[in-house]
Amino acid sequence: MPTCPTWQIQKREKVNLLIDGTYFANKVCLLLYRDYNIKMTILNRLTKREALRDLKEDLRAIKNVGIEIESVTCDGAANIIRAVREVCPEAIIQRCTFHITNEVCLWLTKKPKSEAARELRELVCYLSKINSHEEAQLWMRAFVDWHTKHKEYINERSVDDVSGRWWYTHKMLHRSTSHIMRAIPNMFSYTRYHNVPKTSNSIESFFGHLKDHLRLHRGLSNDHFKDFVKWYLFLQSNQGKASKK
């Protein structure tokens, strides 16, 4: 395979970033920074995990070529949020609403048994239909009302009589509630800033296509695997540039 090309950040004035990482079977993590508006990768990194140091370094590299990071849409990973707040505190953060819905529906299952879980599942499934600030306010009011109604049930605890150890009786309901409450401050940024994407679905789709190609080349050594990914990203990026000319 020819020597891998050197990645260069293409300068532009302002970007609405999608940031996400995906893991492969060989424990390699690919971090991608995508420009939502032109559907192109600005920067990538092959690493072992979504490390705070790497994320901060990459965001600085993007800023250092004169690009203003207007917003970041991500799945809510703690290190991504922290890196954005430390390197570009002026950037708008948007939590991927599809990811929130997916996680909560997975934890609550398709057919929850309790009234509280059924109502929360219905609420969270409505997120995809919210397009305005007014609709977001109504949704949050409904969530607060739901939480007030079921607060005692959500926080109910079970205790081991012997050890005294306790746990939340309705663990997945409590986890889902906490997940939503942590996300709310950055859940509806897109309703106030209309160029901010509300999901990172396009980057997930990109990962899916990459993994489809990799399945056709099973058995690559780690070095050849990384070279394949680098070439794929480079060629996809240049194909995108050509189509926009």
Tell where the protein language model's regions lie, with residue ranges.
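RNase H-like nuclease fold core
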Residues: M1-E90, I180, S202
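A short hydrophobic/aromatic micro-motif that marks alpha-helical segments and, especially, helix-coil
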Residues: D35, E50, S114, H217-G219
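Conserved beta-strand -> loop -> alpha-helix junction used to position metal-binding or nucleic-acid-contacting
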Residues: V72-A78, A83-V124
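Acidic/histidine-rich catalytic cores and adjacent linkers
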Residues: S71-I81, C88, R121-K245
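Short, charged/polar low-complexity linear motifs in solvent-exposed/disordered segments
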Residues: Y36, L43, L59-A61, K111, ...
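A generic structural micro-environment signature
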Residues: A25, L52-R53, Q94, V104-K110, ...
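Charged, low-complexity, helix-prone segments enriched in Lys/Glu/Asp/Gln
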Residues: M1-Q8, V104, L108-E119, W146, ...
